[in-house]
């Protein structure tokens, strides 16, 4: 395999992830999830802890790979990952953390477009829109008062992609007004 091109390096990285990290969730057929460490610990292989955002980024990488070199195996993997996340998350797409939900929503939006999955981000979008506070942003997690860029950045992108541009613009305006530092960097939160 050639590694002197970005496509070659991407293919090599994908093969390493597929070989080392992709497993059935709780030995259930039709499911796949990403083990979060290598070498992996038993608790990670058994998916006792669930790193929702990590799974979202993995699904996004699988979607990127499909755009690079389409494959029916990748489409099957994406469907199995989307199904597994629903099972592992107790039958819900939502959880307590808005950054997790937004990253999973973004990954599902892209995967839906590319793979035509029978899953979508509607419940995540509803949850995030319903959590927008008077300031125009969502908190880091349910019941929290911490307002941060890591949650609101991906929420804004997800809402914009879903056509909720007014909410997305209010969020980005709030980030610019409240978290933008003089250096041009964005602070974590307030």
Annotate each PLM feature.
Residues 118, 146, 165-168:
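Internal amphipathic alpha-helical segments of the cytochrome P450 catalytic fold
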Residues 96, 136-138, 147, 178, ...:
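Flexible, active-site-adjacent loop/turn segments at secondary-structure boundaries
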Residues 152-155, 159, 163-190:
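Active-site cradle of extracellular carbohydrate-active enzymes
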Residues 109, 138-140:
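A generic "structured core" feature
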Residues 7, 75, 99-101, 165:
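Short, structured helix-loop boundary elements
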Residues 47-67, 96-113, 146-161:
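Well-ordered alpha-helical segments within folded domains of soluble proteins
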Residues 1-91, 114-135, 170, 174:
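Low-complexity, Ser/Thr/Pro/Gly-enriched N-terminal "stalk/linker" regions
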């Amino acid at each position: 395999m050639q590694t002197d091109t970005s496509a070659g390096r991407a293919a090599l990285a994908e093969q390493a992830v597929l070989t080392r990290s992709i497993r059935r969730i709780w030995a259930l057929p039709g499911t796949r999830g990403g083990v979060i460490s290598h070498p992996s610990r038993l608790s990670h292989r058994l998916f006792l802890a669930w790193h929702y955002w990590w799974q979202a980024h993995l699904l996004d990488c699988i979607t990127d790979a499909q755009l690079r070199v389409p494959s029916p195996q990748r489409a099957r993997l994406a469907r199995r990952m989307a199904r597994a996340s629903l099972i592992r998350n107790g039958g819900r797409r939502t959880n307590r953390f808005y950054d997790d939900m937004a990253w999973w929503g973004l990954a599902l939006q892209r995967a839906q477009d590319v793979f035509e999955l029978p899953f979508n981000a509607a419940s995540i979008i509803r949850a995030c829109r319903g959590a927008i506070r008077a300031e125009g942003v969502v908190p880091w997690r349910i019941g929290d008062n911490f307002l941060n860029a890591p949650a609101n950045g991906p929420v804004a992108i997800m809402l914009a992609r879903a056509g909720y541009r007014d909410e997305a613009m209010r969020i980005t305006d709030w980030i610019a007004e409240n978290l933008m530092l003089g250096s041009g960097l964005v602070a974590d939160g307030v």
